[in-house]
Every structure is written in C-alpha cells, then in structure tokens.
Curated annotation (Swiss-Prot):
Enzyme class, first EC level, given as a word: hydrolase
Lineage of source species: Bacteria, Pseudomonadati, Pseudomonadota, Betaproteobacteria, Burkholderiales
Enzyme Commission number: 3.1.1.22
Family membership noted in the UniProt record: Belongs to the D-(-)-3-hydroxybutyrate oligomer hydrolase family.
Organism whose genome encodes this protein: Paracidovorax citrulli (strain AAC00-1)
Region entry Disordered, spans: 58-77
Protein name from the UniProt record: D-(-)-3-hydroxybutyrate oligomer hydrolase
Function, as annotated: Participates in the degradation of poly-3-hydroxybutyrate (PHB). It works downstream of poly(3-hydroxybutyrate) depolymerase, hydrolyzing D(-)-3-hydroxybutyrate oligomers of various length (3HB-oligomers) into 3HB-monomers.
Places the protein is found: Secreted
Record field: catalytic activity: (3R)-hydroxybutanoate dimer + H2O = 2 (R)-3-hydroxybutanoate + H(+)
GO molecular function per UniProt: hydroxybutyrate-dimer hydrolase activity
Pathway(s) served: Lipid metabolism; butanoate metabolism
Annotated GO biological process: butyrate metabolic process
Keywords: Hydrolase, Secreted, Signal
Active site as annotated: 305
Amino acid sequence: MTVFKTAPLLIAALAASSCGGGGSGAAVDYDFNVRPSYLNDLRQASYDGAGNDLLTGGLGRSGLQDDSPPGYAGSQPTAEELRRNAIYVNYRALVDTTSEGGYGRLYGPNVDAQGRATSGEGMVAGTEAIAYSDDGSGRRNVTLMVQVPDAFDRTRPCIITATSSGSRGIYGGIPTGEWGLKRGCAVAYTDKGTGAAPHDLQADTVALIDGTRTSATLAGTRAAFDAGLSAADLAAFNGATPQRLAFKHAHSGQNPEKDWGLSTLQAVEFAFYVLNERFGDRSPGGQALRTFTPANTTVIASSLSNGGGAAIAAAEQDTRGLIDGVAVSEPSVQMPANAGVTVQRGGRTVAVNGLPLIDYTTQAHLYQACAALAPSLASTPFAAAFAVRFADPAFPVAANRCAGLKARGLLSAATTAAQAEEALARLTAYGWEPESGALHASLAAFEVAPSIAVTYANALSRASVQDRLCGYSFATTSAIGAVQPTPAAVTNTLFATGNGIPPTAGVQLVNDRSRGVPVRDLFSSNAAGVPTWNLEGALCLRSLVTGTDAAARRLQSGLDETRRTGNLQGKPAIIVHGRDDALIPVNHTSRPYAALNRRVEGAASRLSYIEVTNAQHFDAFIGLPATLPGYDSRYIPLHLYLNRALDAMYAHLVNGEPLPASQVVRTVPRGGTPGSAPAITAANVPPIAAMPVAADAVAITSGAIAVPD
C-alpha cells in the first residue's frame, strides 16, 4: 500500500546527509539510473501546452470534438501530423465526444481532476519519450511511451499505465492517460505488440516508430512491424495473392497477448527511467540517480478492454513490486481452462461462464448476423437498418446465414424469423446477458465478431500472413468487393486512422476461398454461389477452438499462454464493467475473474467489482446518434466510471481511504427519442457508493459471485 511512502526528495536529503558526511572519506555507492537493456530507438519531444500538447495533440477540447479531422499538408504525412491525427482518432474511438453525452461537462480535457468543467481547452504541457522494447533483432519492437506533464509533482510522484485498447497503436489508451496527466502523474503507454500500421506487402513498405513509412529494406530493424518474409517468399506471395496487407497483431508470429503483462511492466520501468533522467538527483559527476522508485512512487495499472486485461496481467506477473493498485474498465481476461467458478445473477446460475475471447467470439461470428434479424430485437439500435441492408431480397446475406446454419444442423427452426430467434437464444445460453441482445445488430453490421475472430485466431496460432488462415486475408477493396491496390493516401495514414484489426479505415476482410476470385468477405459466395457472409470461414475458425487436429492444437496452445491465474498478489483492484457489454460479456470476464481471485487469494483479496447498468463496450457509438440512433437514449458513458474508479484507487493508495464495496451501480438512461436524446445530467450517472444498499451489493465468495438483478 502506498500510504506512508517516503517522498523521494526526503530520501535524497537523508542520503546526502549520511553519505560522505563527517569527513570520514568513505566511498559513496551511488544508485545510478540505468537505461533498460531492451530499449531501442529512443526519442523525446517537448510540448508547450499551447501550440501542441500531450493530451490533445494541440487540438484542445474543441478540436477533439470537431467532426473534421486534422489535415495533412502533403501526400507524405509528417510524424507530427500523424501523431496529432492518431490522438484525434483514438480519443474519439473510445469516448463519446458529444456535449449531450457529457463531453466537456462530465469528462473531457477541460474537466479538471476534481471533476469541475472549466472554460479552457485542457491542453497539457510536458515531455513525451517513445522507444521500442526489443532484443535487438527488430522482430518484437513493442512500442513504449512515457508522457510526463510539466505539472508532475516530485513530492508526490505517481505513474498510471494506459496500455492500448483493442489492437490499437501507441495512442490507443489516450483517454485513460488523460486521467493521469490531469493528476500530474507520468503516464506509461504501450501498444503491447499490436498497432494500426501494416506491412504493405505489394509495395514492401512498413511504418517506423513514429508512423512515417519507408521501404522494409531501409527500415531494417527499425520497422514497427515487418511480416518477416524472405525475398523469395514475398515475391511468391505477391504473385499468387497480390495487394495484401499484413498487420502486427495478426501476423507477427509472436502471440503478443501472452506478453501484454510484460509489455505493461516494461512501460512502467521505462517511466521510472524517464522520470529519473529528468528529475532525479545527480551524482557529483552529473549522472542521474534512481531517485524515483517503486518504494516512493504510486503506480496504478489501468486502461480499458484489452488494455485493462493487460493491466491485470501485469499485476499478476509483477515480481518487483512495481504496481501498487489496479483500476480497469471492461477488461478482456482469459480465464483458466475449466476454472470451476460459479456466477449467479438474481439468484439464477449462469450455465456457461469464463470462456476465452476466441471461444465466445467465434460463437458470435457464427450466430450474431442471424440473431440480429430476430423480431424480438426489432426496436433495438440499428436493427431496422440491418434488416434493410442484409436481409433484403437483393442481398439477403444475413438471412442466408440463418439458412446456412439450418442446413448445417446448427439451427432447427423453419423460417428466417424463427431461426433468428433461435440464434439469439443460443448466444444468450452461451453467456451473453439478455440486455446484450440490443447490441447484436449494430455489432454484426460493423463486422466486429469476424474481425476479432480472424485476427485472434491468427495471433494465437502464430500464423504467418502466408498461411491465409481459414482462407482470410486483408486488403483494400472496391465498392463491389474486388481486391484493389491500397492507395498511398490510405497506407500512409493508417498509423493514425486504423485500429489494427480489419475491417478498419478502408481495409477489409477478404475471403480468398470465395467462388470465382477472392472478394471482400461480406460479399463472398460459397461453392454453390450463395452469399452466406462466409459461413465456411466462420466454421473453420470455430473448428480451431473446438477441434483436435494440428491446426486446432496450435491455436489452443497459444490460447493457454494467455490465460490468467486470478492471483493479484493482494494488490487492491477495482474492475468496472458495463452489464450490457456484448463484445466482452461480463459472464466470461469480470464476474468469473472476481470469483477466481477470491478463491485464489482468500481473505487477502482486495478486489472490488463494479457493474454498471445501461453501459456497454463502445462509448463512441453513443456519440453517433445519426448513424446509431438509440445508443444515445439507452446507454451512459462507462468511461466516466473508469475515471471514478481511478479516483477511488488513488484516494485509497495515497490517502488510505477504503475501497468501494462490490456493487451494481444503477444508472438512468437519457431516454427520449432515439437519435435526439436529452442531454445527460449527473442524475443519469450516480456515483459509486462507498457502501451500497443491500439490493445493490455484489457478493463474492471463494469461487463464486452473486450479482443482483
């Protein structure tokens, strides 16, 4: 616990008074600040908080809210232009930036550390250091970054981790970093071996650490990601499969998720190095000393989604006492196989819980597009538009998916409507909460399950881009789905505009096994010429999870490398999760993890679980009322509760305040007309209670969790 940690300046003063004093002539054994051996390609920049800054890339609150992204002066974007756009895109991808949704009033750059909305732009002056973590081979090249605000308090030093969400690049945790910057904390980021910039195999160009592009030959070991093909293999691949792209998460061959905890811990180590280089005391020879250490610096591991899972992994794997506490939102955590925990809601036992992401996502990939046509979901966001787009007689791809599942014996109902209801029931039986059903149509329309299933199957299998696992590849396509060359304007900006997991920023999933020629997955046809949204590809991916052949064993072996233990080593932790989450369902992640942690740690467990009603995974979708009407009237911003969890953890570690008890926070939807919901108020988002009323209390015992309705 960080309370009573001795301030580094006091330690320095004590050391000065005890070393070399009294004329003893004794030699002083200085504790020099040593650069971690894995750091490569280190570079630093300073930002004045006026023309440019750490948090908003010089855009300020207003610029981040502007629907028009920053421009580029020429066809070859500069590193600074890419940085600014990456901050803009990633912030808006993770946060609702509409005023009606709370931006600028309840959260956002201009809302200070005490939650007060100011009239300023919220820009943060400071320094930014960025480097690779690698063994010198250039094959790993995980990006690490440390932002140190000028307001960093040397007397109360703190570090917050903000590991990237999803498969995003280094700025993919910037909304979490915002909390730390406002507190005067250093923020430790890592892309955890993922990232948005691809290897363009046809052009043989790659991105450098700053997003600018060059040839793979010139980049050498400085490439953020190189697919690692020999010249002969690259030529053969391009000849047989032209115009394809390789992405780091899918195609690095590293199974990066197994090291997400390590990458986060290395980001913290990098932060200590940067702090000591900048603020540490100096030896008589001018060398920086290890003034800031885990013993005197408060460190909170945080972030959301995959970044939240990385924070939990880091806390489990922390052998040096680097991390004091954890505060995360909707973490993706892979439970042990056959964890044997019990999850209850409202007194009813959840039959299926604790499955890994690749398992439940390949199940969603099979059934979600069909389930989205269920009549019981007709009033949910995007359901009507989904039916028009994907069940129209001219393009009945979702209805054909239902029929294809029936033909395979995976559904039994006779009509499309009944098949859709059956598909929905199968998802609910597989661990999705009933409230999650309202999100199936929009997630299916955005091809969320296929994108995750393809990337993670490749990653866990350590597949090469050459393997084209289950017949999938990545490419830019035309309006009718034909593979085409990726325009330089797309490739050169993907570092900023992409999310690292196609479909993204114009790059699509391609079905290389489509009848005739490879075509965009959505438009592809089976051997009989029927468009089924590539049911065969979905079944292939599913077989890697459930099968026993060599390909399945490879994936399953990689999956086992990513499973968590539940042992947070007694560290205090707060997990916040939206009950309605349809991407990372609570029954497979946060709920069973809390039960596992209590079984592993027993009375030493200090984990609080906060489940938020009317909250789901994609806050940014709330800010798209014209595209996704109904998100605004149904859902509140979960990001606000991550901020509150961080507030509570900081108060616990620094001031000794008790952690909030595990509970359900009952929010109030904005209501009104979908697409034009009234502005959110504080009444919609009640605080996390220090001690909830009995009806809201979550009971966690050894291997079991009971959540009230």
